[in-house]
Amino acid sequence: MGSLFRSFRRDAGATAPSVGATPAKKEPPPPPMTPLEKMLQDMGAIREDGSDKFFGMENYGNTCYCNSILQCLYYSVPFREAVINYPTRTPIESLTAALAETLRYPNPNAHLEAEAQAEKQKAANAQRPGAPPNQPQKPEDKDSPEYKKKMALQTFPLLETKNNAPSYGMSESLFTSLKDLFESVVGSQSRIGIVRPQHFLDVLRREHEMFRTAMHQDAHEFLNLLLNEVVANVEAEALKQPSLERSLPPAESSESVEHSGSSGSKTPNTTRWVHELFEGTLTSETQCLTCEKVSQRDEVFLDLSVDLEQHSSVTSCLRKFSAEEMLCERNKFHCDNCGGLQEAEKRMKIKRLPRILALHLKRFKYTEDLQRLQKLFHRVVYPYHLRLFNTTDDAEDPDRLYELYAVVVHIGGGPYHGHYVAIIKTQDRGWLLFDDEMVEPVDKNYVRNFFGDKPGLACAYVLFYQETTLEAVLREQEQENMDPALATTETNDSLKQNGFAQSPALGLVHSASQIPSHDEPHRLNSLKRAPTAPSLPTHYEHTDTNSAPSIPKPAMAPPVPPIPETHSMPLSPKKSDLQSRKERAKEEKERKAAEKERERQRRKEQEATRKEQEARARENQRREDAELKAALEASRASKADEDRRNQEGQKDRDPGRSGHGLSRLKRGSKSFSHRLSKDKDTRVPSSSNPGVPDPNSPPLNNTVVTSEHQEQEQQPPSDQQPGASRLSKKHNLNDEERDANKDPKQDKPGHGKWRSFSLRKKSLGILS
């Protein structure tokens, strides 16, 4: 028994650590696998073309515009092959030797050291005299993009590029730095990592002053500049090499051509590969409406910029791009056939289609009221496959089919700030999200979340389409529909910790976003340094829950990302509330500044409108005064004319006219005597004459004429009637009345009135 206890004590002493000895350290747990690492677990050997490399790019402060465009160009297979093969392809042995110096593997325990440092910092902050006691500290969200980027920098291989232009036989330029970048990724023995494009940025800032500042830059402008710089550098180097090409033997030259053709480039020294990939030809057709002659003018393009309309699509935008435009008024067309300015119709059509079509959606528009650029959040739908219809009749391959392979997304409220990310379709692994240092797989439907109508500030800005065939499209669709259950399982496994395509998680995040005091500040705060799409797309995917019926809901478990996001707020309410108040105060300040600016512009417009109305009122008043003055002048002139006519009427009634009347009476007396000779047998006393008017009653013209005519027929001869002289005068007046009845001037207004009045007056005078 004693020996048994001694052996047990001896064994216990051997196993128990001594007092002065240090305990053995446990192996540190490996860092958790990222969704990208899980996706690449079943991949085979590394390829030599670099199509299976998925490297992020470090952001040096507002360089996301450069990272997103470089990623899109790298995953364009023909462009990557052309860059690597010009002027010659660097041997893989040389690349491996160079990468041995530039590729650096970080400490695998760096994440543990970072966590320990964070704990020490937290303890130091708690021991400060000014720190409030027992204040809960907000734990770091391990599913946030910022944390993932930080961990990627600490755990992934870091690849730095150096100037290898002498090995290419070229001088250092933007093209050689781009070639260094692509060759470093292709020659790396690791599938994942982070590239440091510091050398590329140094060359870019050295040659172009506009990129030397840390200001927010435009990704489309950088794309256009980069393509033009590559063309210029390649053509400049080609001019230096004709003597070298002529010195090469014909056999060696043909051998180099065949080798380059097998590696993906047409010739090692060709300078047209950028034009063949990105360049297209636009034809401007102008038809004169006078002579109907059509004139054409061709121009090349490296990308197409299209205007946007609300609730439209890329197809409708292209249709508007090629719509007929009327050239009239001040914008008339000078027709050479007519020899002058004429009205015309103008339209733009595509004559030669590029192999890679870069579509720039013009999201930024200058507004007159704000006097600055403003972002348009219009809904513009872009398809996975596109066929252009606005081509000329003689276009080369007008039925070319394109497939979408990359989307550059702008996240932000305006053109002067924000963030760029790229969503790219890889050759074998589907769609990936490239957000600076972070690379994560996403679902195919995730690409549809940036039409511009979803909540948030993320919108598609540049679309990259590459040529494809109908057979390839059908083969891809068959592959997608071949085994939906297997595809669903793989998607759930690879995206379990990503949170992009999980409908239940999106519902949780979407419900949390309804709280304005927490979600809105976090969403706006993500734009400060490097806002990414993982938090924003969760809002977008919520509306696309029904768009993926192939994923069964029971097989999808709630992912990890939304859990810390929903529970992190109540863990540290004071700190989060303080941060929220600061952000809300900043947002309120910006909003008030914008409101003041809008109010100032509104007052300015109102003042301009008021001045315009006053000027218009003064002009109307002057016009009315002029019209009134003209009316008064016309009235005075008419009054003078009326007075002159009255005076002439008075002259007609003066004694001078009576003489004229007597002469007329004399002529009438002759006719009266002539009538008396015919009516000798007719004798009627004057007292019985019914035609004598009553002096007390005003006679009418017709009455006077009728009565006097009867009297004229019944009047006895002048030698038997004592008042023959009076009757003679009276019959002379009757002759005047008959002449007046025959005169057409009697129907004129005013003329007959005065004559009837004079006849009545004279008749009464004779009777009296």
From Swiss-Prot:
E.C. designation(s): 3.4.19.12
Active site (record annotation): 64 (nucleophile), 419 (proton acceptor)
InterPro entries for this protein: Papain-like_cys_pep_sf, Peptidase_C19, Peptidase_C19_UCH, USP_CS, USP_dom
GO biological process: carbon catabolite repression of transcription; protein deubiquitination; ubiquitin-dependent protein catabolic process
Residues covered by region (Disordered): 1-33, 114-146, 242-270, 515-768
Compositional bias ranges of the Pro residues kind: 551-564
Transmembrane stretches, start-end: none
Keyword field: Coiled coil, Hydrolase, Protease, Thiol protease, Ubl conjugation pathway
GO cellular component, as recorded: cytosol; nucleus
Compositionally biased intervals (Low complexity): 713-722
Family designation: Belongs to the peptidase C19 family.
Task performed by this protein: Ubiquitin thioesterase component of the regulatory network controlling carbon source utilization through ubiquitination and deubiquitination involving creA, creB, creC, creD and acrB. Deubiquitinates the creA catabolic repressor and the quinate permease qutD. Also plays a role in response to carbon starvation and the control of extracellular proteases activity.
Protein name per the record: Probable ubiquitin carboxyl-terminal hydrolase creB
Gene label: creB
